[in-house]
Amino acid sequence: MVSPVPRVLATEVALELIRTLQSDYGPVMFHQSGGCCDGSSPMCYPAGDFLLGDSDVRMGVIGGAAFHMSQSQFAYWKHTQLIIDVVPGRGGMFSLENGRDVRFLTRSRLFTDAEIEILEPVLVGAA
């Protein structure tokens, strides 16, 4: 049996930062910002601090942290795999990496036709 293709992945440096944040804050979660105040950065919060709504989509889990975005944003990104990375800079004002001189960054690539057939399912709603 073929393994499902994940919709979201993290680089090793991103996984290391996630582990550090989990050590400092306990369980964490991500929500892909829609582009208002913090651009379109993945925002990291203590698990449960960001209130998910009925229209949020859980894309997957990276480093033990659930990764969400709005359903309307998912409509644009559903054909892409998100790759969460870390780059130098300032994190989003409310994101847990803020003040560490690094920030999470979302990179993406289009799925192949073959991959689209075996994607991991998403969960819709405050899951």
Q: Where do the model's predicted regions map?
A:
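Domain-level signature for proteins that mediate thiol-based redox and metal-cofactor handling
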Residues: 1-127
